[in-house]
A protein has these predicted regions:
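Short coil-to-beta-strand transition motifs
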Residues: 1-3, 41
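Short secondary-structure edge/capping micro-motifs at helix/strand boundaries
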Residues: 31-32
Length: 176
């Protein structure tokens, strides 16, 4: 972006500075001081630069999963792999401070009760993932995440903490 600098912090957060960026939050010094540090706007997004120096956004910093081995895993790119299948309508990957990743899945109407087909999709996707990014188990949910249940934002993003709370028992059962 012209006249804008972009770099990554040590934890891969995207930092931006330039004349076209906001100077701070209106009448909110506390939020401004948390967001703009030494002239750099901390976006809250995680990213990396590819071989051609293009910036790839990995997901939100506050959505990062840190497994029991201390590895940081961005769930959004993994979820996108599963959502590329028509048979998967919704998915949320979970595994914070856990030994492996699991998922809540809302399958499409066509395969709603076909756990074998969902398992086949998981096996297919997992074949191309590193060991720590493989989704070992999943739970088929009966109802989709929704705005009405407070599990989705108005822009249809998953409210992970609320879903984790609502499905706590189901998620924990995947670690037994």
């Amino acid at each position: 972006i012209h006249l804008t600098e972009i770099k990554l912090s040590k934890d891969k957060e995207i930092l931006v500075r330039g004349k076209s960026l906001m100077q701070g939050y209106w009448k909110d010094k506390k939020s401004t001081d948390k967001t703009i540090i030494n002239g750099w706007l901390h976006t809250g997004d995680l990213g990396l630069f590819d071989d051609e120096n293009y910036l790839k956004i990995l997901g939100r910093k506050n959505e990062m999963i840190v497994n029991s081995g201390g590895e940081n895993i961005a769930p959004a790119p993994l979820e996108d792999l599963f959502l590329s299948y028509d048979e998967i309508d919704q998915i949320m990957i979970y595994g914070h401070e856990k030994p492996y990743l699991v998922a809540l899945v809302y399958p499409s109407e066509e395969i709603k009760e076909n756990k074998k087909l969902v398992r086949k999709i998981f096996d297919e996707v997992n074949n191309n993932l590193s060991l720590t990014k493989k989704i070992r188990k999943f739970y088929l949910i009966k109802n989709p995440f929704s705005i009405e249940s407070s599990e989705l934002t108005p822009t249809l993003k998953i409210k992970r903490r609320i879903v984790e709370k609502n499905y706590h028992k189901e998620l924990q059962s995947l670690y037994k």
